[in-house]
From Swiss-Prot:
Catalyzes the attachment of proline to tRNA(Pro) in a two-step reaction: proline is first activated by ATP to form Pro-AMP and then transferred to the acceptor end of tRNA(Pro). It is found in: Cytoplasm. Homodimer. This is Proline--tRNA ligase. Keywords: Aminoacyl-tRNA synthetase, ATP-binding, Cytoplasm, Ligase, Nucleotide-binding, Protein biosynthesis. PANTHER family: BIFUNCTIONAL GLUTAMATE_PROLINE--TRNA LIGASE (PTHR43382:SF2), PROLYL-TRNA SYNTHETASE (PTHR43382). It catalyses: tRNA(Pro) + L-proline + ATP = L-prolyl-tRNA(Pro) + AMP + diphosphate. SMART domains: ProRS-C_1 (SM00946).
Length: 483
């Protein structure tokens, strides 16, 4: 493989093939998910579904990087909505919601019949959920009403890269109705916190979290909360977003609920989503020149256990089955392979696939353990494995985050003068600075430097002069190129 530090684009393309993650589809921007990548997406689904069901508490072997500021206390129903809708619905929303103009795939003909109102392949589902809610007779007893679906969406993208920007991709989207905007805003923040826990704690991705600027937030949203990760090329990757939509969509679709006083009231809504783009973030952040490196909580197989016994020693076999039983009791996701040749080939395959820990039992006394993250081997007796396994996993988890954070720091500049900022842009780094944030400044950044404001943090308590306008400023922001 091309070295990651020499040519990130070539390395990434080769990684996807070597690790058997995808095959390219026939249509530009589409891919065939192979079992190695789809298995990871299924684990993402499990992590999120457990989280919204309040089953996904961090175990004792996790080191918490982020503590949610609000408790999660919502009931979420799993649903599946149609892929097709009418083009006229999107045209209607363009007149109601400034900026709501997703790039659409249109179907103009069904069989031999030309359609007067073309069909649209789902680009997002705000409209679909609004049409669903409009058909339901709702009262204040029914609210909040929150739905989640796992599905695919379609965007007519010009420049595509697998996982990072696709014409067809998979995601989860959660949509909810509430009696007023204070509740929809609180829900948006709660789900944003949930994403942070998953992305930072479970996936070990260092992230910058905050609000989207006015020009970058979701069209129609009162506010959009984002989670941004800096990739090895200095670009920012949007990992997940959560939107307080207020009554923007519900008023447009004349959705109502019956209040306690039997009045028809307009509810507020929110939506949030995370897509298969998160897999691209994982691959870029953690993987190396030898193949995938996967977070412990994500790996479809956390351990591969090999019984390598050429001499048919019953004591060696007994040790292997002791380890197998031990892993089963801990509910570790693992595979057990009995082989008597080509062990090196199997270990190499496991390395490319990013198996966190590979264990080899080839004698009656010790277990050899290969750590994918450090690429180091250790030997433990079964007694030591029992006492040290939690530390093995915890160290893997925390070291993965540390390494990822060190790489982010190399691609990040905390600067304030215009000269420093321009030098950082020249060096293809992301920038943390304080500015006077205006629409004019955002357009200037895009036009002159081809960068954008990715994230807005809490306002600074210290008055500084904006490096671009020389006016007093309080807005702490992350500025970067974006995927």
């Amino acid at each position: 493989m091309t070295k990651k530090t020499q040519d990130l684009t070539s390395w990434y393309d080769q990684l996807l093939v070597k690790a058997k993650l995808i095959c390219h589809g026939e249509v530009k921007g589409t891919v065939c998910f192979l079992n190695n990548s789809w298995g990871l997406w299924m684990e993402i689904q499990q992590l999120y579904n457990d989280a919204i069901a309040n089953k996904n508490q961090l175990s004792a072997i996790a080191l918490t990087k982020f503590q949610p500021t609000t408790s999660f206390c919502y009931q979420v129903f799993q649903v599946q909505l149609p892929t097709l809708s009418f083009y006229s619905e999107y045209q209607k929303e363009k007149t109601h919601i400034k900026g709501f103009n997703p790039e659409l795939f249109l179907i103009n003909q069904v069989g031999q019949k030309q359609l007067n109102d073309p069909l649209v392949l789902r680009p997002t589902s705000e409209i679909a959920f609004c049409n669903l809610w409009k058909k339901q007779e709702l009262s204040y007893h029914d609210l909040p009403l929150i739905y989640n679906q796992w599905t695919q969406v379609f965007r007519a993208e010009k420049n595509t890269r697998p996982f990072l920007r696709n014409s067809e991709f998979y995601w989860q989207e959660t949509h909810g109705l509430f009696v007023d905007q204070s509740q929809s805003e609180q829900a948006a923040i709660s789900f944003w916190n949930l994403y942070q826990d998953l992305i930072i704690n479970k996936l070990c991705i260092p992230a910058f979290v905050g609000l989207k600027s006015e020009s970058e937030k979701f069209a129609g949203a009162k506010n959009t909360w984002t989670i941004e990760a800096i990739m090895p090329d200095g670009q920012s990757l949007q990992c997940a977003t959560s939107h307080d939509l207020g009554d923007t969509f519900t008023k447009s679709f004349t959705i109502s609920y019956q209040s306690k006083t039997n009045q028809k009231m307009t509810p507020s809504s929110f939506s949030c989503g995370m897509s298969t783009r998160i897999l691209g973030a994982i691959f870029l952040t953690h993987s190396d020149d030898y193949g995938l490196v996967l977070p412990w909580y994500l790996a479809s197989k956390q351990v591969k256990l090999y019984l390598f016994d050429k001499n048919n020693n019953p004591k060696t076999r007994a040790l292997a089955f002791l380890v197998k039983d031990f892993l089963e009791k801990l509910k570790i996701r693992f595979s057990f392979i009995e082989i008597n040749n080509q062990l090196g080939k199997q270990l190499l395959k496991g390395e490319i696939e990013g198996i966190p820990l590979q264990m080899i039992v080839d004698n009656e006394k010790t277990i050899n353990i290969f750590n994918r993250l450090t690429r180091l081997k250790t030997s433990l007796t079964f007694a030591n494995l029992q006492t040290e396994f939690v530390n093995l996993v915890n160290n893997y988890h925390t070291e993965m985050y540390r390494k990822a954070n060190d790489l982010v720091e190399q691609k990040l500049a905390r600067v304030q003068t215009l000269k420093e900022i321009e030098q950082a842009f020249k060096n293809k780094k992301a920038v943390l600075c304080t500015v006077k944030l205006t629409g004019e400044l955002e357009q200037h950044l895009k036009t002159k430097y081809q960068v954008s404001v990715r994230c807005v943090f809490k306002k600074s308590d210290v008055t500084q002069n904006c490096p671009f306008t020389n006016q007093p400023c309080f807005d702490s922001v992350l500025i970067a190129r974006a995927y």
